[in-house]
Structure formats: structure tokens, C-alpha cells
Amino acid sequence: MVEKIDFVVAWVDGNDPVWRKKKAQYDGTINTSKEGMNSDKAYREWGTFKYWFRGVEKFAPWVNKVYLVTDNQKPSWLELNSDKLVLVDHTEIICNDYLPVFSANPIESNIHRIPGLSECFVFFNDDVYLTAPVEPTDFFSDDGLPKYVTALAPITTERYGTGHFQMNDMGIITTHFTREEILKNGKFFSIKQGVKGIAKSLLYRHSKFICGFWENHLTHPLLKSTMELVWEKEKDVLEKTSASRFRSPSDTNVWLFKYWQIASGQYAIGNPKLGGLFSLDNAGPDFWKLLNSRKYKVMCINDGFNVQNENQVMDDFIKAMNQLFPDKSSFEI
């Protein structure tokens, strides 16, 4: 049984005028349109972050510490005296020469530097919510290995998508692990991966090259020691990502460390039905019911690019979250 598991979440308030002024000093040549890799959409704050904390307290009361990583920001409702909360500034984990940064990639690549962080921790994006009770064994095996569900699957890239980062991640993985090692270590054909996962892997097992790993886009259980090892092996690449003020096609991202665990065989197979990825593009009455059904323990609820009647959808989202989490958490004033 793992003794301590911490949660780490990164957050930005894109509505903060001080932060916006700082960003404006650097983003003159950056494409911030809706279709761009550095779209302003990525920084929007709708007032839903408190529900992330309510989910943690309600459904994972066993968590050791919750580390909130920000750029000298904090939500107005945050209770700084909460016993489990630790506020972490970018200056504590990223070299000052690279700051400020307005991309998640350098932040996520340096979270292992958080002072006091436990060896076993779970990294969350702020749109990944706990929506039913979870146990430590949903994220780590009894002997401390992170749990993933994966499969062999090609990485698809779009001009402004994140597939570029995963391609770069896989380039590093295939430098350090042979095709044979990955197939041997990856556990892709275990029945625990689920029928769909095995079917994906069977399609690509005879490919000349390892084309990528399927990713469920939920939580990221990670080992601090693995991040340190990858940094030791690929310092120059990770320094380049750390210095990337805005998203760039040459970046790596946090999935690199998960990929390393898979390629080395240092992971345990998780529950294929743990959670799901959803977009507010398609939100409606059926989705709000699903959100409150507790069918999934973890839900990534993505603020989509093509949400119709955006303000109404966000109002409905907040109402649904209030039904699921009607009570304030100890993380709130």
C-alpha cells in the first residue's frame, strides 16, 4: 500500500488584468485566435475551479497534500490556511531565466521540483474532475506503480493541436527503448487493458515502428523519481521545453513521463472504465444527468472550441456541478 499520494493541479486566471498585462508584453507575434495553438480559450476562467476542490474533498479525502501551481495567482475564494493545501508559484519550480511562461508544457515538465512533493503523485489538469469516490488503488498499485490504460495507436497531428507534443515525446521514447523492448514491456495484450485496447494494439503490433500510445486524457499518476530520471537522460530537450514561453510544435509535454513508465514496463494496468473524456461542444440534458450519475469516477470536461450558446452552456454546467457538489469544501473561505 502506498503510504502517501499527493495531488498536483495547475491553474491560471486568464481574466486577471495583471496577468493579462504581463502576457501582452510577450504575445505580440503569437497567434491567439480560437484555432491557434495558443488560443485565448486556453486561459479562460469560468468560475468552475472550486468544484475541482469539492470533488477532491468529497471523493478523495485520503489525499495527503494538494499542490496548486500558479503564476502568482490564487482564486479569491481559496482558503490558504487549509491543512492540505500548498500554493506553489512558478518561481519555485522553473528557472527564473525562462519566466514568465504562458504554456502548460514548461510547468508540467517541472512539477517534480515542487518542494515536499511525494514520490507518488497524481497530476490533474483543471478540467479533470473527480465525480465519484476514488481510492489510492485507482491510481497506484500496492507496490507503488502508476496505473494506466493504454494501447498501441498512431498519434494524429493537427496544425494547432497537441499531437506535435506527443510525437516529440515518442521520438524520445524510441531513442531509449527498442521496438522489441516496448512490445515486451508495454503489457498491451493483457486482458486487463479491455477488449477495445487489445483490438487497437493488434492493429499496430506488426508496424515497423512504434507509432504511439493511446492516451485516455484523464489523470496522470506519476513517479517523481521517473521524472528525475528522464530529466537526467534528456536535459537539453526538457530545458528547451522549459524555456518555451508559449506552446511550440517543438515542445514535449507531461505525457513523456507516462510514456516512459509504459515503455519501461514500470506501470500497472488500470481500470478501463475509470473515466471518460467529454466536450462541452455537445453538452445537453443527457450530459448533465450523466455528470450526476456517478457512472464515471473521473471526467475530463473540456471547454470545447465550438460551444454553441456558450454562456448558457456554462450556466448549465455550473448548475449541474452545484447539484453534484452543493457544499463548500475546506479549501474555500
UniProtKB/Swiss-Prot annotation:
What's a Pfam family this protein contains? Stealth_CR2
Q: Which keywords accompany this UniProt record?
A: Exopolysaccharide synthesis, Transferase
- The first-level EC class reads transferase
Q: Which residues cross the membrane?
A: none
Question: What does this chain do?
Answer: Part of the type 2G receptor polysaccharide (RPS) biosynthesis locus. Essential for cell surface RPS production, and the host-like Gal beta 1-3GalNAc (G) motif of the RPS. Probably encodes a 1-3GalNAc alpha transferase.
Q: Can you tell me which family this protein belongs to?
A: Belongs to the stealth family.
What is the name listed in the Swiss-Prot or TrEMBL entry for this protein?
Answer: Receptor polysaccharide phosphotransferase WefF
Species whose genome carries this gene: Streptococcus mitis
